[in-house]
Amino acid sequence: ISAEVQVYEPLIRKYAKQYGIGEYVELIKAVMMQESGGQGNDPMQSSESSFNTKYPKKANGITNPEYSIECGVQEIKSCLAGAEVKSPVDMDQIKLALQGYNYGNGYIPWAKETYGGYTLANAVEFSDKMAKEKGWESYGDKQYVPHVLRYYSLGRIPNGTGNQVIVQVALAQEGNGGDIYWRWYGFGR
């Protein structure tokens, strides 16, 4: 995750907490990293989101980074709910939510009804279908899920061990300092 994205962590945390998805800060940072690397005035690339009601609904229409983050967090929340994500490590459902963030609100119900969830193959199929329907050369990023997940530390096991995932989940707990997880894992923090 770039320094430019890290600068936005306090705002990401603020809006994630405000919209009830405080445990997904790392996922939101990974999305921002893929969308913009933290660059520009629309770092979440959320101008075309249904949550943008103040700026033009065109690429880079939002010119206020904080508003972009607020809209992006709401869009991610909507995708997490639509995909029925249960936790920050519910990777099958997170993949569905991420592709939905990139493709818009039609993908999640289509993938669930047609295939029972996300696959790379159905992401390609949906993109091709939508591009054809709209008369466009392409539609979205067919590889969006792997592109985002390369930045998501909870989505992989660093250095071949599972300990880091557990520690990061514990650290992400707001309000209790992760104490229940630290005790569960054998630390007397």
Enumerate the predicted regions with their spans.
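Non-catalytic cell-wall polysaccharide-engagement segments
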Residues: 1-5, 55-70, 74, 78-167
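Surface-exposed patches in mature extracellular/periplasmic domains of secreted proteins
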Residues: 22-29, 83-99, 178-187
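Short, functionally critical alpha-helical segments immediately adjacent to catalytic or ligand/cofactor-binding
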Residues: 22-39, 46, 69-73, 97-103, ...
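Short, surface-exposed glycine/acidic/tryptophan-bearing loops
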Residues: 39-59, 65, 116-121, 180-189
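N-terminal capping segments
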Residues: 157-189
